[in-house]
């Protein structure tokens, strides 16, 4: 026994607290030890020395029984079917809570007669109760109960109370004794009771307390309750982010040290050793692993009968289509618990995804769930929706915030610090806008528009942080660590002033940023200012992460600053030794910023936490902050206040991105941007930030759900509004200004058409000098260019016709070719001859006279093409439409890949099966496409790859046909294949783990379905599970689909080898037959044969072969 265990036993002996949970534990212990209740009060963990085992001391019978409980002997989906009694109890409880669940349960009842009976029984009980009430009400109002009636009613109440007493679980009123190293707070005890009630009613749930309220401790306490009170030792699976693996292990060691916790992590060999020697041998209670490890080790984890699956940061599975969500749904578990501080991020469909994971038998249809919360405009309907949402969420969701439950934790003070830009930042910001001025003005296509705008947004946000994030911006080489790191970024100027003040006050600071390269700059800054620091980002190893956290949190640590990336450092890290959080930039998802703040603002924090969020004023970051406030307000309305309207996703659309980019852009070009200098007063900046933060919060707190559904929650702003002015084109009497680069303005005569002016007018721009009375001439519409996909097989003649049409249009509008048309460089584009001549001089200076002459020659050639372009006639237009109709314009990429896959699966000549496999096209369409495809295959980019895939599929198909034929012929030669079929095993087959009967069964099943059958090996698995031959054959019943496919492949290889070497195998066949005819059945196989109808007990098999492999049943070896 360890010293730690002796100390714990000594502590528990001296403890005399008598909580209800402890009484129950003591009762259970007294039954096993034969002692009285009074002797065991407060000794929930004290067992006799004989009963306190180490792993090695446990008797073999204990491990055998434990392994039987931990490891499934059937497929998880069949094991789930055995839990129907839990399902009925769960349904009955939920129907008692609210009749709204009948909508969901009614769907399940259509396929389950027992659920139908349950619903009828509940309806019958309700009708009886209704009739009794109606009878009483219809009688005289002076009617008094007789003694007999009252006695009957009292007896019924007593009986019901007795039943409830036996069924009700013990209510925990204070911190239970099995929780060591501290006590649960009152609200944590309430959370433990809530988890216990979920367990008793066979429900899964979502523990959604605000970050920092001790969700980890509540979960560990609940698992301790299951272990020490309910005698459920496990197995429990806890899936957490990689960064919190060690934190969870430490928490278990601290609060419930006697629980056997295993962390599944490491390289492939290490994990394989853990799975083989610990997990599958049931030598653990709680398994902690990461999301990535669950995906990699799914086959091993799927074999255990989990009592609980706990998922930390459960919003990771909000997408039910993700790999993690789908894999975890395959696991067997009695119950599931989700832990998240952010239950709602975007919309209610994500909340449904979490509920669907917890209770798939109830929340199986997302459309039905969404229909519940469709909301009309009337206030009465809104009230009904709110009530419905509360009724649905109450049994599953527990959500509490710090302000309501944790009175000792001071509220954090958040301040948005609005910062101007330095001259260098302004210059880079303008340059980024000018680089893609068309996109800034909204002149982007639908297909590439959002990606193009996202790229601009990313670059602008980098500029707001520090211009040195761009290659070539930092002066050098040589590169120096000097004051220029600070005075070239507005945020760095304010950070420098703020950190100096915090250092004097004795505060300690966490600095978060999305960009790890910015942390590099901050590292240089800390080195320059002699600030001791730690750092964590996405590339930090698990060991280095733990070391950095311990170093920062140790008593009297010299570390002043902790640098973290928002995503890598915002999960599961306890840094309460810091009292100041600086968000250098804001995450798109406001919940990520909240998680970052709560690394310091959590239980255990004794100081007031200040959060400073840096925001670049009059730039894109202001819009990002408004977007974050909108999302947080939505969370507050839907979850914390119960407003249940179905909400549209608040993702960033193209208009949203455009609005962010345009915000403050005009001020940049007009030299009105907010500036900051080294002399800025930090007090004035903080005071201004506090005021603007209060205004922003007040604005969004006053908004309702309908207001939040608008673009950005303020009045009727759209993507065309910035600086309080609307630039959207409303009518002809108000012409909108186009945002022009600061370098120059373009001047063109209005008497001729210009393509640039034409597009400006279409998008919403125009000339300042346009008057209300002078109508502008309408520019002709540019002809649409069809850019077809290569697999759509447009006729080659179409390209020539489209070029002819484009040249004719340019000739018609007097289009002048510029250097931009040749080089694609906006710096070379001119608007008149004078500008072009000046640019030619610049080109000559930079690239030489030869480059200038070549550019001029190419411009002249292109202009000559336009000037001499022939007319595009009506006949040309008709011919163009005719050519377009010949292309396969209704075939998309998905249809094309479906055709390729079908050709690979069935062979290019099997048109019947190819037609059937493409559901989106008629058989005639597929046939016509196939003909053109094989004629013009080489016109497709990467045609060699597609052809190679088809040829590989055809070869595989031929091989399968050949194997099918050999197998069928071999089986047809036997009158009773299961008895007489002979498999020619190789001479060296000592490692073979399948016996002859299992191999024969697999071959007969494959012959039954065919090698090319869909889901062949799932069908084989089903045949094995349903066959009486293998009732007690644990080995074959626990083979996975992948293992069965490998075995079938090996057997087919043996059959092919037998066919290819007939002479060599002929002698073997005769010897084997002679031996097997004289060999009696093994006792095991004889018993199986007698239990199967029409299976003679004289089935010929090899007894020696069977006996050799009996001892190998529990091994999973690699096959030869």
From Swiss-Prot:
Biased composition regions of type Polar residues, renumbered to the chain: 1080-1104
Location(s), subcellular: Nucleus
PTM-bearing positions, type Phosphoserine: 17, 19, 831, 1082
Start and end residues of each Helicase C-terminal domain: 494-645
Phosphothreonine carried by residues: 1079
Family, similarity comment: Belongs to the SNF2/RAD54 helicase family. ISWI subfamily.
Record-given protein name: ISWI chromatin-remodeling complex ATPase ISW2
Gene: ISW2
């Amino acid at each position: 026994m360890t010293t730690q265990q002796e100390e714990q036993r000594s502590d528990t002996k001296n403890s005399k607290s008598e909580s209800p949970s402890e009484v129950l534990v003591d009762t259970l212990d007294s039954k096993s030890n034969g002692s009285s209740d009074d002797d065991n009060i407060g000794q929930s963990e004290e067992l006799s020395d004989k009963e306190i085992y180490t792993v090695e001391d446990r008797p073999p019978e204990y491990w055998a029984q434990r392994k039987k409980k931990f490891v499934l002997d059937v497929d998880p989906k069949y094991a789930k079917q055995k839990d129907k009694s839990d399902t009925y109890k769960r349904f009955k409880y939920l129907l008692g809570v609210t009749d709204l669940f009948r909508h969901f349960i009614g769907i399940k009842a259509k396929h389950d007669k027992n659920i139908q009976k349950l619903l009828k029984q509940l309806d019958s009980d309700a009708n009886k109760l209704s009739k009794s009430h109606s009878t009483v009400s219809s009688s005289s109002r002076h009617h008094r109960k007789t003694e007999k009636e009252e006695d009957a009613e009292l007896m019924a109440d007593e009986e019901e109370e007795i039943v409830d007493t036996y069924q009700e679980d013990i209510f925990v009123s204070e911190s239970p004794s099995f929780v060591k190293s501290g006590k649960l707070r009152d609200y944590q005890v309430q959370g433990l009771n809530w988890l216990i009630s979920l367990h008793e009613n066979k429900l899964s749930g979502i523990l959604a307390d605000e970050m920092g309220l001790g969700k980890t401790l509540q979960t560990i306490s609940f698992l301790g309750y299951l272990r020490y009170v309910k005698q459920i030792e496990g197995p429990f699976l806890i899936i957490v982010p990689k960064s919190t693996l060690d934190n969870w292990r430490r928490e278990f060691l601290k609060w419930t040290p006697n629980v056997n916790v295993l962390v599944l992590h490491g390289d492939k060999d290490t994990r394989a050793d853990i799975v083989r020697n610990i997990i599958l041998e049931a030598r653990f209670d709680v398994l902690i692993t990461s999301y990535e490890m669950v995906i990699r080790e799914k086959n091993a984890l799927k074999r255990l009968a989990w009592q609980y699956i706990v998922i930390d940061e459960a919003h990771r599975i909000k997408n039910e289509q993700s790999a993690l969500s789908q894999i975890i749904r395959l696991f067997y578990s009695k119950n599931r618990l989700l832990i998240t501080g952010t239950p709602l991020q975007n919309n209610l469909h994500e909340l449904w995804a979490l509920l669907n994971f917890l209770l798939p038998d109830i929340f199986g249809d997302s459309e039905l769930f969404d229909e519940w919360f469709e909301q009309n405009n009337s206030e009465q309907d809104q009230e009904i929706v709110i009530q419905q949402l509360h009724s649905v969420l109450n049994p599953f969701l527990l959500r509490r915030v710090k302000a309501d439950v944790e009175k000792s934790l001071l509220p954090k003070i958040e301040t948005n610090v609005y910062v101007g830009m330095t001259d260098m930042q302004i210059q880079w910001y303008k340059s980024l806008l000018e680089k893609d001025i068309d996109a800034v003005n909204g002149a982007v296509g639908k297909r590439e528009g959002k990606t193009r705008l996202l790229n601009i947004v990313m670059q602008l946000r980098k500029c707001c942080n520090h211009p040195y994030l761009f290659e070539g911006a930092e002066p050098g080489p040589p590169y120096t660590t000097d004051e220029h790191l600070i005075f070239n970024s507005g945020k760095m100027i304010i950070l420098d002033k703020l950190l100096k003040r915090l250092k004097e006050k004795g505060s300690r600071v966490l600095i978060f940023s999305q960009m790890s390269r910015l942390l590099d700059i901050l590292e240089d800054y800390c080195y320059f200012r002699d600030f001791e620091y730690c750092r964590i980002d996405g590339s930090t190893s698990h060991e280095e992460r733990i070391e950095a956290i311990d170093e920062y949190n140790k008593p009297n640590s010299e570390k002043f600053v902790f640098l973290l990336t928002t995503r890598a450092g915002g999960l599961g890290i306890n840094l309460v030794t810091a009292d100041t959080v600086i968000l250098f930039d804001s995450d798109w998802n406001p919940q990520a910023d909240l998680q970052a703040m709560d690394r310091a603002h959590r239980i255990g924090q004794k100081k007031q936490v200040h959060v400073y969020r840096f925001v670049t004023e009059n730039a894109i970051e202001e819009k990002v902050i408004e977007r974050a406030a909108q999302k947080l307000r939505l969370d507050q309305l839907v979850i914390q206040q119960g407003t249940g309207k179905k909400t549209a996703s608040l993702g960033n659309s193209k208009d949203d991105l455009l609005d962010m980019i345009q915000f403050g852009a005009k001020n940049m070009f007009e030299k009105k941007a907010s500036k900051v200098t080294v002399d800025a007063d930090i007090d004035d900046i903080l005071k201004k930030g506090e005021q603007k933060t209060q205004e922003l919060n007040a604005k969004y707190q006053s908004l309702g759900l309908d207001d939040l559904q608008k673009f950005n929650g303020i009045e009727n702003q759209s993507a065309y509004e910035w600086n309080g002015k609307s630039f959207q084109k409303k009518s002809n009497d108000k012409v909108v200004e186009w945002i022009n680069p600061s370098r120059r303005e373009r001047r063109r005569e209005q008497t001729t058409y210009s393509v640039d002016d034409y597009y400006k007018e279409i998008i919403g721009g125009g000339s300042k000098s346009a008057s209300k009375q002078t109508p502008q001439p309408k520019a002709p519409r540019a002809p649409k260019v069809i850019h077809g996909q290569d697999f759509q097989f447009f006729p080659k003649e179409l390209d020539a016709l489209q070029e002819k049409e484009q040249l004719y249009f340019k000739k018609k509008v007097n289009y002048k070719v510029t250097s931009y048309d040749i080089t694609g460089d906006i710096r070379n584009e001119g608007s008149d001859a004078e500008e072009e001549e000046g640019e030619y001089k610049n080109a000559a200076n930079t690239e030489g006279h030869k480059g200038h002459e070549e550019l001029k020659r190419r411009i002249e050639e292109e202009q000559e093409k336009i000037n001499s372009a022939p007319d595009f006639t009506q006949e040309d237009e008709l011919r163009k439409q005719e050519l377009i109709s010949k292309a396969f314009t209704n075939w998309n990429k998905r249809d094309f890949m479906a055709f390729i896959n079908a050709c690979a699966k069935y062979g290019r000549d099997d048109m019947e099966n190819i037609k059937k496999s493409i559901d989106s096209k008629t058989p005639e369409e597929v046939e016509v496409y196939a003909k053109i495809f094989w004629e013009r295959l080489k016109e497709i980019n990467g045609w060699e790859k597609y052809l190679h895939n088809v040829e590989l599929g055809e070869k595989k198909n031929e091989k399968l046909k050949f194997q099918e034929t050999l197998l069928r012929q071999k089986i047809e030669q036997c009158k009773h294949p299961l008895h007489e079929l002979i498999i020619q095993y190789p001479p060296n087959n000592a490692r073979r783990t399948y016996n002859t009967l299992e191999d024969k069964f697999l071959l007969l099943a494959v012959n039954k379905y065919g090698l090319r059958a869909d889901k062949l090996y799932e069908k084989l698995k089903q045949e094995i599970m349903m066959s009486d031959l293998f009732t007690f054959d644990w080995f074959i019943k626990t083979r996975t689909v992948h293992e069965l496919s490998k075995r079938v492949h090996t057997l087919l290889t043996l059959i092919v080898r037998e066919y290819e070497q007939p002479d060599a195998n002929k002698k073997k066949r005769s010897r084997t037959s002679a031996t097997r005819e004289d060999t009696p059945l093994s006792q095991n196989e004889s018993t199986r044969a007698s239990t199967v109808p029409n299976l003679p007990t004289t089935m010929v098999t090899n007894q020696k072969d069977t006996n050799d492999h009996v001892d190998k049943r529990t091994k999973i070896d690699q096959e030869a």
